[in-house]
Amino acid sequence: MTDVESVISSFASSARAGRRNALPDIQSSLATGGSPDLALKLEALAVKEDAKMKNEEKDQGQPKKPLDEDK
C-alpha cells in the first residue's frame, strides 16, 4: 500500500484535481519523441523530391550533346 500512497500524495500535490484534469502528466521529459521534427523532415524531403523532378523534366526536354561536338 505504500506505493499507492506515494502516488496519491504526488497526485494531490500536483494541483491536477477534478474529473477533467485527473490525467497523468504526459508532457514529461520521457515523452519527447521525434514527432515535432517529423513535419520538418517530411517538408525537406518533399522539397528535395520536387527539385529532383524539376531537374529530370529539364533533362528530358533538352537533347543531350555528344562529347565530340565541343571541339
Swiss-Prot record:
InterPro entries: cAMP_dep_PKI (IPR004171). One of its GO terms (molecular function) is cAMP-dependent protein kinase inhibitor activity. Testis. Keywords: Phosphoprotein, Protein kinase inhibitor. The record marks 16, 19-20 as: Important for inhibition. One of its GO terms (cellular component) is nucleus. It comes from the Eukaryota. Extremely potent competitive inhibitor of cAMP-dependent protein kinase activity, this protein interacts with the catalytic subunit of the enzyme after the cAMP-induced dissociation of its regulatory chains. This is cAMP-dependent protein kinase inhibitor beta. It comes from Rattus norvegicus (Rat). The gene is Pkib.
